[in-house]
Amino acid sequence: MTLVHTCGNETGDESQNRISEKPVEIEGLVFSERADSQYADQFAIDRYDGGYSLIQVADGTGYLIVPENGKIPKGISKKIKIIKKPVGNIYLAATASMAMFDALGCGDRVKFSGTKIEDWYIPYAREAMENGDILYAGKYREPDYELLVSDGCKLSVQSTMIEHNPEVKEKLEELGITVFVDYSSYESHPLGRCEWIKVYGELTDNRELAEQLFQKQSEILDTIGEQPDTGKTVAFFYISSSGQAVTRKSGDYVNKMIGLAGGSNIFKDLDNGSGTSAIQMEMEKFYATAKDADIIIYNNNIGKDVKSLDDLISKNSFIADFKAVRNGDVWCTGQNLFQETMKIGEIISDFHLIFSGEYKDNPPKYLYRLEGGAEN
């Protein structure tokens, strides 16, 4: 199995990346080093003497991390935002980043959540909200400004969804809250997303731990890469409320995870010409190709209502005639699959266990098999 390091983002639009190839010159600061990046290309970390760091993200924005009691340099570009240490009282509206704060032992840096308690599948986040240690402060597009200001929030970590609501971003900044936009969803390689833990390690003074956690996932992938391709074809999808099959475009990171695990998407060159990864298909068209897939992986993170093979078949009678259904090779994602950004190597390993048949001796953690089919 060959591992390929790729550049660009999910949409294939590499022109979006405006990270400077050279260190940014900042008056009064002496450049020290640029942090290594193995898979990620949507951020860069430049370090300067005196404990200063500059995190650049794909849209060209820079975030200067100023050490505690450090002075803010003069004449800084308007494209550079200031984050003063110690970092805390964070309003976290980028759900995928919670796993990174948690893995670093810095979950307590997050004070406000843009995700409701019932939508968290990371134990720390759910428990912290139950205990009142993390407060719900509204979704990214409708934050509770009064709560954020009254409780001293100075930093908001957002996903790129905030770009669809620029007025919210502007309002937060007007209130003195720096808005950090996480571009990990634009990483073309699955481990590129995981590598963003280095960004959060930089913010929280946990560089070494961040590197160790990333390398652990990278080593898992290296081990899988030494195994031969399984030759198994896979259909990854869910059924929408309107009865359509919703799968992923061929360049999507989930399909890349499937490929890295030794499988292949049953759909070749599937693209909708837009920035979204979701592809909606009429069931008849979907059935024509997906019926021959060796393995079905049902994305239960969306509907959350498939507990058995009968539940799945009840969504559309065509499913009963799928090869994978007849052979008992039907699996579901756990509801925590897409929040566990620091387990990407392990999730790819789970895919490999399924594709290789090794799951019989080593059950996967993030997927479960639906009972039914010829084998059961």
Task: Identify the residue ranges that each predicted region occupies.
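Soluble non-cytosolic domains of exported or imported proteins
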Residues: 138-143, 159-166, 187-194, 207-211, ...
